[in-house]
Amino acid sequence: MDAEEFFINLFDKIETTLKKTAQEKILTRTWGGQLANELIGKGCPHRSERDEPYFALPLQVKNFKHIYESLDAFILGEMLEGDNAYYCDKCEKKIPTLKRVCIKSLPNYLIVVLKRFEFNFDTMQKIKVNDYFEFPETLNLQRYTLDFLLEQEQSLLDGVGGESQMEVADKKPHSYYDYDLRGVVIHKGNADAGHYYSLIKDHKDTGAGNGDQARWLEFNDTDVKEFDISNLKNEAYGDSATNNLDPTGKRNKRGTNAYILIYERKQLFNEKSEKIDD
């Protein structure tokens, strides 16, 4: 069982245990968001939307160098055309349709799973993707949300005198989309075997003599020690031609990279997207 499977099983067990209690929705309120699965007709005014709950956002690593590149691809979608065109019940015909997924709502604590494990159908083996993949300490997700995309589409329609069939939601404050990195789960090894350890930002201690820089800790089995966040690149981003070189010029930490990221919203919000006072 890898870390993602453990996380899924843990949340399933917690949800089952809390059913019919006062805290039944605590995981959803804290960690849960919603994705919007959209079908957008091209050449017809109709569109459909199906909501999908999530506790973790899965992002591709392969072929991307940065988390924002992967997020751009996440919401890009695909065109259904020709034989694959979508049948519009209202138009009573097949039409070219954009099928895409975007973020409808965000949780206070966002889990991002980096897809570092995949199945190679040529070799019929599970492999680990050790490619370099950068992620920031501060993350803004506004342009990957349904509200933002609808607003952009409405602006385009306004420019050409068109009319949208979708209602644009009330604007959320910018702080709704801003996150700080709070934790990183590192995997060291290959697709068949390995070891996990965690980097966690100390919420209470800013670090003596370190100004406003928060203290980070490394939790590795029973070993707990301070971690210098300036070393995050070498510890967690993965392998590249120029990354992870030791003093002799040889690569080190091959196979050691981030697998799961935990981001905390800078300003907490409730289910109604209202700020929660500190």
Where are these regions (language model features)?
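Papain-like cysteine protease catalytic cores
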Residues: 1-53, 89-92
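Exposed substrate/partner-binding surface patches
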Residues: 19-22, 26, 46-278
